[in-house]
Design a protein with these regions (language model features):
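N-terminal Rossmann NAD(P)H-binding glycine-rich loop of SDR-like oxidoreductase domains
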Residues: 15, 23
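Substrate-binding pocket helix/loop in short-chain dehydrogenase/reductase
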Residues: 89-90, 94-102
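Active-site loop-to-helix junction immediately N-terminal to the catalytic Tyr of the SDR YXXXK motif
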Residues: 93, 138-146, 158
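Active-site helix of classical SDR
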Residues: 113, 148
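Alpha-helical segment proximal to the catalytic Tyr-Lys
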Residues: 118, 160-165
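Residue(s) in the substrate-gating loop at a strand-loop-helix junction
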Residues: 132
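Conserved Rossmann-fold SDR core element
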Residues: 163-177
């Protein structure tokens, strides 16, 4: 595994199963990581275990990215591992459900990327976003998350074209995984 020492990587959603596993893998490969999560006790415990820095921030809060930028100025990469799952039939889906999920999964990802776009460009960095297989395959009661993550996939291909060749943008779309929200 390549040594990524001195190149800072941000992990949003660092207390979730995906984010914490990624943090551990990057740290074990020698990367300099910075964790971002809303739960202070959980993110602090992970940061202490891994010997890395962290910011307590909720991506649903206005100005969350400024809080992160107060702690980190330059980065090489970013993983937006924030996720949610709100399963219900279409007849029960509300506009508020859709707005919250879009804010969490799409709008805040855009704000995070915009906040570090210049640094990523300067450092020829990379961005990893997360979707779900439900965005491409039909699953009952997945209206909220599937449509929101499909928007994340659209963002990914758009930014990959817009940022090339300076910033690489990819999206991972796992199926069910063993996690707190699965």
């Amino acid at each position: 595994i390549k040594n990524y020492m001195s190149e800072k990587y941000l992990i949003f959603g660092a207390t979730g199963s995906v984010g914490s596993s990624l943090a551990e893998q990057l740290k074990n490969s020698g990367s300099d990581i910075h964790l971002i999560a809303r739960n202070e006790s959980e993110v602090k415990a992970i940061a202490e275990k891994l010997g890395c820095s962290y910011t307590v921030a909720n991506v649903l809060d206005e100005g969350f990215i400024e809080k992160v930028k107060m702690d980190v100025a330059e980065i090489k990469g970013m993983a937006y591992c924030v996720g949610s799952i709100d399963l219900k039939p279409l007849r029960m889906v509300t506009e508020a459900d859709m707005n919250k999920c879009m804010k969490l999964n799409l709008y805040s990802a855009i704000e995070a990327i915009k906040g570090f776009q210049e640094s990523l460009k300067k450092n020829k960095g990379s961005i990893v976003l997360f979707s779900t297989v439900a965005a491409q395959r039909g699953f009952t009661n997945h209206t909220i998350i599937a449509s929101t993550k499909a928007a994340v996939e659209g963002l990914t291909v758009t930014l990959a074209a817009e940022f090339a060749p300076h910033i690489r943008v990819n999206c991972v779309a796992p199926s069910l995984s063993k996690s707190k929200i699965a």
